[in-house]
Amino acid sequence: MIDNNVKNNIDESTLQNEKIEKEELLESVSTVDNVIDPKNDQIIKLKIQLAQLQEHERNTVLRLTAEIENIRRRNTQEIEKIHKFGLERFIFELLPVIDNLERTMSISDNSNTLLSAIIEGIELTLKSFLDTVHKFGLKSIYEINVPFNPEIHQAISIIESEDHKPNQVLTMIQKGYILNGRLIRPAMVTVSQSK
């Protein structure tokens, strides 16, 4: 930042010095007018033309430098996006696996001693799997009895209810997921409506 300010100050002072030189040359041309011989007149015109070309080149360099800096900044932002959302498609394909493991856990019967070890293994696998995807920025949307938010919820059905406020999420049909702040699947819910 300091380098840019110093560079801008140097560029501005150089431009001001060149403008002063240019004005002095123009004044000297106007005061002497026809008294100067043709060679000196031509030299002065060439110096003026040279000063104009130098100013034009300096402006071009400044403009191109700014454009290069903008390109670098955009590339940095694009790389950050790629790192952040590069896993989006992969994680989206894993969501049905998470759903199936959760469904298995919800219908499992812990009273059967033969299956309890298998159920415990599935539970540990699901926990480990969820911990791993959470490390990469995946968050689930699963709250009920919250206001319906069309940005993260998809209403599957509307149920009339006097016990709940209107537009409240009553039940969760399928969890939704957000990856690094970006919705990758909305939560499918039922919503309350007043009678």
UniProtKB/Swiss-Prot annotation:
Keyword check for Chaperone: yes
Any one cellular-component term (Gene Ontology): cytosol
UniProt keyword Nucleotide-binding present: no
UniProt keyword annotations, A-Z: Chaperone, Cytoplasm, Stress response
Entry superkingdom: Bacteria
Subcellular location, record wording: Cytoplasm
SUPFAM superfamilies: Coiled-coil domain of nucleotide exchange factor GrpE (SSF58014), Head domain of nucleotide exchange factor GrpE (SSF51064)
InterPro entries named in the record: GrpE, GrpE_coiled_coil, GrpE_head
Pfam families to which the protein is assigned, alphabetical: GrpE
GO MF annotation list: adenyl-nucleotide exchange factor activity; protein homodimerization activity; protein-folding chaperone binding; unfolded protein binding
An individual GO BP term: protein folding
Annotated function: Participates actively in the response to hyperosmotic and heat shock by preventing the aggregation of stress-denatured proteins, in association with DnaK and GrpE. It is the nucleotide exchange factor for DnaK and may function as a thermosensor. Unfolded proteins bind initially to DnaJ; upon interaction with the DnaJ-bound protein, DnaK hydrolyzes its bound ATP, resulting in the formation of a stable complex. GrpE releases ADP from DnaK; ATP binding to DnaK triggers the release of the substrate protein, thus completing the reaction cycle.
Record HAMAP family: GrpE (MF_01151)
UniProt family annotation: Belongs to the GrpE family.
Subunit and interaction comment: Homodimer.
Name of the protein this chain belongs to: Protein GrpE
Organism: Blochmanniella pennsylvanica (strain BPEN)
